[in-house]
Structures are given as structure tokens and as C-alpha cells.
């Protein structure tokens, strides 16, 4: 029984997203982030992004871009972006 409960908690910990739910829920790889207000040259990462260190690696491999969690992306630009959980 203890193993079962520990497994449930471990599974839940693995499912935590690097981007918060709600407003900043869109993971993006961006070329420039201007004071967290505007991000330029953004696109959705080509690979799944769990955990945060993997998100950094994926964006870095895609042209040295910065991983960000943003509001709704429009035409390669995002407004209001924050750093993802688990990144430097």
C-alpha cells in the first residue's frame, strides 16, 4: 500500500508542466525577450518540454533561442512572457 501511494505522488510530480496554467500556459522558444513585455521571433518547441532543463536544451538547439512561457502567440510575437519553472 505504501508503494502504491508513493507511486501516485511520484507520477503527479512528473506531470508538472514547466509553464503555469492560465495566462502564461504557452511554451515558446523566443529569439528576444524585451523586459518580459514582448518576445520576438517565437515558435512552439518541436519536442515535448518536460522538465525545464530539457526545455532550455530544446530551445538552444533551435537556434540559441530562450525558453519562455507566454500568453497567446500571434505571428511569431508574444506579449507578457515569464521564465519557465526549473530553468536558470
From Swiss-Prot:
Gene name tied to this protein: HFB2-1
Name of the protein this chain belongs to: Class II hydrophobin 1
Keywords annotated in UniProt: Cell wall, Disulfide bond, Secreted, Signal
PANTHER family linked: HYDROPHOBIN (PTHR42341:SF1)
Disulfide bonds: 19-69, 29-59, 30-42, 70-81
Protein purpose: Aerial growth, conidiation, and dispersal of filamentous fungi in the environment rely upon a capability of their secreting small amphipathic proteins called hydrophobins (HPBs) with low sequence identity. Class I can self-assemble into an outermost layer of rodlet bundles on aerial cell surfaces, conferring cellular hydrophobicity that supports fungal growth, development and dispersal; whereas Class II form highly ordered films at water-air interfaces through intermolecular interactions but contribute nothing to the rodlet structure.
Subunit: Homodimer. Homodimers further self-assemble to form highly ordered films at water-air interfaces through intermolecular interactions.
One GO CC term, this protein: extracellular region
Domain of life (superkingdom): Eukaryota
Locations listed in the record: Secreted; Secreted, Cell wall
Induction remarks: Expression is up-regulated in the presence of root and stem powder of Shanxin poplar and under nitrogen starvation, but not under carbon starvation conditions.
Cleaved signal peptide residues: 1-15
Family per record: Belongs to the cerato-ulmin hydrophobin family.
Predominant cellular place of this UniProt entry's protein: secreted
SUPFAM superfamilies membership: Hydrophobin II, HfbII
Amino acid at each position: 500500500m505504501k508503494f502504491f501511494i508513493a507511486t501516485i505522488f511520484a507520477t503527479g510530480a512528473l506531470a508538472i508542466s514547466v509553464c503555469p496554467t492560465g495566462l502564461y500556459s504557452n511554451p515558446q522558444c523566443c529569439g528576444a525577450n524585451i523586459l518580459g513585455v514582448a518576445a520576438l521571433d517565437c515558435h512552439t518547441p518541436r519536442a515535448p518540454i518536460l522538465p525545464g532543463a530539457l526545455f532550455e536544451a530544446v530551445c538552444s538547439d533551435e537556434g540559441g533561442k530562450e525558453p519562455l512561457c507566454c500568453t497567446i502567440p500571434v505571428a511569431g510575437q508574444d506579449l507578457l512572457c515569464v521564465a519557465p519553472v526549473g530553468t536558470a
